[in-house]
Amino acid sequence: LVGSEMCIRDRNGAIIAEPGEFTKRAFLNGRMDLTQAEAVMDVISAGSDLALKAAQTQLDGGVGAQVDELKDNLVHVLAHIEAYIDFPDEDISPDTASDLLARLRSMEEKLAALLRTAEGGRLLREGIRTAIAGPPNVGKSSLLNTLLGYDRAIVSNIAGTTRDTVEESIQMAGLALRLIDTAGMRESSDVIEQAGITRTNRALETADLVLEVADASMPRVKDHTAPALTAPRLLILNKCDLGVHPDWKAVPGIRFSCATGEGRKELEEAIIQAFSSSLPSETGSSLVAINARHQHELGLCREHVRLASESISRQESPEFTALELREALTHLGEITGAVDTEDVLGAIFSSFCLGK
């Protein structure tokens, strides 16, 4: 029993650390803000080089610094508005109103820029859900195994071997990909195969990227992949080592061979290109990507900044403008923890490992 939880607690008065307790104490003692505390878990769970870089930027205060800059600008505008509340005989001059509006509009642009990193942040943290789809027996499972570098899915010459989705994660071109091998898409009366195709459709609906696989050595067949998908699609012309059928000669796609590895570099480049506008851009050694909680608060902050601008433009009473600015400040404070609630802290730190 020496060293056991019961022995330590009962004989020495120690208590077992709660999830995230060390990080929570660092936050409560002012050693880090809430964005940095969140980044601790992001660093631990990073699934790719870019995800780690974004987490490290946040841990170093990259997100918090931008929020603090926005807060300072808001306080500056609010101070001017409060002065007119304290001295009601003075009206806001056109020049002052113009300066304040310019500052608020600049803030709206910065908020919009931060909000645009939210989708990229999700892709970095969760990985790009990549569905491998196509007709039966075109080499979807072989593609999965080739990209993984080991045999994960059963491969055979019998069409319809894959009946259920198989999911694995890899890192490619600095990004985390969650590869999902799916059942072949075709019309079938087989109940089990129909269930597999239903799961395939579900995977396609939630995918961030679809790799449409075709057997380039055979004549082109009807495409059963759902046409209404919004996710980017990349056509993989597989089995090119067996020769390319005339039907595929003029079709744009990535020539690939699971047997020789041909086309892997082109696939990596195509994936980077497909998400070039979604992923956050690097600035020097920094990579800022907000999370869903930040996105929610920044969105609300932006709305209140917009309402404050409208209030000034309409020459409303400064009390209304001040109210919107205070609300905007509150939402910024929620991000860094300057304004916090136990519910928010509990939700964040409960996802940590014990201690940490």
Residue ranges and their predicted role:
Residues 179, 213, 236:
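Generic enzyme active-site microenvironment
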Residues 17-49:
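A conserved P-loop NTPase coupling/switch region
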Residues 175-178, 183-187, 192-195:
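Noncatalytic alpha-helical scaffolds and linker/capping helices
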Residues 9-17, 275:
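A common structural junction motif
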Residues 193-216:
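Inter-motif core of Ras-like GTPase G domains
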Residues 1-8:
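Short, small-residue-biased leader/transition segments that mark boundaries at the very start
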Residues 177, 209, 234:
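Short, Asp-centered acidic motifs that coordinate Mg2+ and/or phosphate
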Residues 52-171, 188-190, 217-356:
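C-terminal-of-GTPase-core extension/linker across diverse P-loop GTPases
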